[in-house]
Amino acid sequence: MLSSALGNAAILRRFIVLVAAATFSMFTLWAVVREMIDAPPGDYEVRQGDIMLGDGKFEGAIGRFDAALAVSPEHRGAMMGRAIALLELGRVDEAEQAFSDLIAFLSRSLAADDPTGLAVLAAGFANRGILRDRDGRHEAALADYRQALAIDAGAVDGPGLFHKIVYGDAKPSTIANRADYIEAQLALPEDQRLLRVPELDARQRMHKP
């Protein structure tokens, strides 16, 4: 009789554990589903794309950003992420056009009381500047950097903790520092300019508010 009682207690404990695990799983699933339902169209896909960007899976990231744009054609996070992924893949012309399209869209549609939108616009100019800088078009890069700083200097002050962890760089190059450097170099006679410093250029990171 005692062994039977002990056996029943063990069965009851297993049942309680299984029910608790099932309940936790259902709440987790429901939280994910609610997040997908409650989020604005395209946000879930953009978060997936951002994760892939951080993992260096640029083709996959473009797929998720395209999926976001399919349901929300003016999703600025998707537009920005897609442009960054194109640049990281070396598809420079497509990336530049994507940044320019984002800048044009925000310039004509942005409300003055939209600080997040202003941060994205500043990042768009900063990222296009980085693209042009890497491509050797330093005057155009400088113009983009200055425009980014004029719109929202704080938004392009430098990549945050996420980038420092992902890229292992505690002191990434900032837009302001790079703009000052280019401006100083362009003021020199052409044969004295040093506009490419590979170890410093490698510290430049894309900006995605």
For each predicted feature, which ranges?
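Flexible helix-coil transition and linker loops at the boundaries of alpha-helical arrays
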Residues: 33-36, 103-119, 154-165
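Alpha-helical segment of the N-proximal tetratricopeptide repeat
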Residues: 38-71
